[in-house]
């Protein structure tokens, strides 16, 4: 995992944590499911994160 990839994942986790602090548990869980699916797809397809499209985050 590259440093850039790790930073992007950490930033997305921070977003989920912010959503949890705000009390919107449904959106936080949904965002974690989106992140999980994208990570699994990258591993399956062998796509580097820099080539992967952005995700539809809900806040």
From Swiss-Prot:
Q: Which domain of life is it from?
A: Bacteria
| A family per Pfam | YciZ
Annotated family = Belongs to the UPF0509 family.
What protein is this chain from?
A: UPF0509 protein YciZ
């Amino acid at each position: 995992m590259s440093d850039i990839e790790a930073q992007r994942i950490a930033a997305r986790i921070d977003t989920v944590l912010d959503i949890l602090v705000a009390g919107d548990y449904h959106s936080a869980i949904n965002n974690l499911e989106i992140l999980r699916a994208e990570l699994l797809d990258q591993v399956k397809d062998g796509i580097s994160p820099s080539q992967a499209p952005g995700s539809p985050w809900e806040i």
